UniProtKB/Swiss-Prot annotation:
Its main location: nucleus. Residues 101-128 are annotated as: Disordered. It comes from the Eukaryota. The keyword Transmembrane helix does not apply. It is found in: Nucleus; Chromosome. Core component of nucleosome. Nucleosomes wrap and compact DNA into chromatin, limiting DNA accessibility to the cellular machineries which require DNA as a template. Histones thereby play a central role in transcription regulation, DNA repair, DNA replication and chromosomal stability. DNA accessibility is regulated via a complex set of post-translational modifications of histones, also called histone code, and nucleosome remodeling. One of its GO terms (molecular function) is protein heterodimerization activity. One of its GO terms (cellular component) is nucleus. Residues 111-127 have a biased composition (Acidic residues). This is Histone H2A-like 3. One of its GO terms (biological process) is heterochromatin formation. Belongs to the histone H2A family. It comes from Homo sapiens (Human). Keywords: Chromosome, DNA-binding, Nucleosome core, Nucleus.
Amino acid sequence: MAGNKMFCRPRRQRLSHSRRAELQFPVSHLERCLRESQHARHLSSTTPVFLAGVLEYLTANILEKVGKEVKNSCRLCITPEHVKRALQKDEQLRWILELEDDTHSQVEEMPQSEEEEEEEEEKEEEMVVLVVMGGRRRRRRRRRRKDS
């Protein structure tokens, strides 16, 4: 029995859900988001994989059309205007812009108290100071704190 040693196989490297499905989109992240949203009581193991595949297909399709739009306009960098123009030209993808318009119309601003409005005004003033003063921001903030 002394000659019988346990044979250990080398462990295979773990593969992520995305890699197993040969997708670029993060399947595990989508699964976590779906579980946290609690829209459904039970979630199939293939649901996030399918959703990642659909999102990847849509993204690739949109980027292909946007790339053609950028090439036609003789530019090197993709801007939001290029994306919007490409979506407007494609009849099948135009619904994405309609979704965007619906979400903007449904969003309403929350009523704010006077304190929250003052805090927001201070933040806006600080942003102006940041833009104007550039690298001297820290010194300026310290002086204000000492004075008050």
